């Protein structure tokens, strides 16, 4: 009897069955790889979306006093920079820094519905803020309109009592000028290095700007601390609806700076304690817990951990860090770190505490920072002084995280 050589024995798998099994196995492998790749892309894009950035030109610190910058606003409405400042280097995309976009965006939504009556030098519009808010300094500027030339003039003169944003106890302030709701076009002053009471005396012209459109705008000034190697830190902001200002002549204002719209409150808070032991020449920093941390991942959460840097005379001395708390916006750490600090070096010592969001597949994100020293912000200075006044006792305090 003839037997088909292709026929399989009853217990053995046929060629077709083996082929189908191989195809299924390969398909499952490809599917798993694609799912993993999609998850990685989704997480990475999610972080970028949460921290969407706009490109900004670097302020030129070499410009002279009293110089004018002009933006020509044609009837079509788009602003074009037509008058470069002498000595200013051209903007180069490769030499631009990034800044949070949310401050200006949030302000457009909140201010267009709140047109408050203002008078030059008046500060009554800020009374509702309460006297307990942090002092961010104040700024002096002038604004007026030339009807013959259809030009709005803004002069930024000076600022006083700005807070220190650098761990060296100073700031490098400059000012951005917007006419909201236009967020795309802006003008900037030069940077004043290491100066908490800067004088700019710079004049800015918005040319070809019909008066009926000017009164629909909000003059917005944002003071920032320039950082050459990272994002600039917002110091404070001021806004004035131009339909509430007499623009027939130059009006001069002194206005207190308010927290920027993307301010520190949205980043969360950190509870920590400091314990100073003068006989042992040491400070113990206890990172206790955080609350309401900013969500950095697309899933609406973060993987926070805390870095603690000991600085002496602007130089890094020692770093410690906590464990990472997965998917937690209200983590509890309870981790202590001891630092050796001789008494005679206390005055030049700064402790920088940074809350980070851990990311395995990309660079870790900064959620917020705290600078502790005798020359930091009011809340930080109070904690530092309380620590020294109560030796060998842990002194705990909540701190707002800052950009």
Swiss-Prot record:
Modification type Phosphothreonine: residues: 58
Function: Ca(2+) sensor involved in Ca(2+)-dependent exocytosis of secretory and synaptic vesicles through Ca(2+) and phospholipid binding to the C2 domain. Ca(2+) induces binding of the C2-domains to phospholipid membranes and to assembled SNARE-complexes; both actions contribute to triggering exocytosis. SYT7 binds Ca(2+) with high affinity and slow kinetics compared to other synaptotagmins. Involved in Ca(2+)-triggered lysosomal exocytosis, a major component of the plasma membrane repair.
Binding residues annotated for Ca(2+) 6, in chain numbering: 359, 362, 365
Similarity remark: Belongs to the synaptotagmin family.
UniProt xrefs under InterPro entries: C2_dom, C2_domain_sf, C2A_Synaptotagmin-7, C2B_Synaptotagmin-7, Synaptotagmin
GO biological process, one term: phagosome-lysosome fusion
The organism of origin for this protein: Rattus norvegicus (Rat)
Post-translational modification: Palmitoylated at its vesicular N-terminus; palmitoylation is required for localization to lysosome and phagocytosis in macrophages.
Protein name: Synaptotagmin-7
Name of the encoding gene: Syt7
Binding site residues for Ca(2+) 1: 166, 172, 225, 227
Stretches the record annotates as Disordered: 75-106
Lineage: Eukaryota, Metazoa, Chordata, Craniata, Vertebrata
Subcellular location: Cell membrane; Presynaptic cell membrane; Cytoplasmic vesicle, Secretory vesicle, Synaptic vesicle membrane; Lysosome membrane
Keyword hit for Phosphoprotein: yes
Binding partners and assembly: Homodimer. Can also form heterodimers with SYT6, SYT9 and SYT10. Interacts with calmodulin (CALM1, CALM2 or CALM3). Interacts with CD63; required for localization to lysosomes. Interacts with APP.
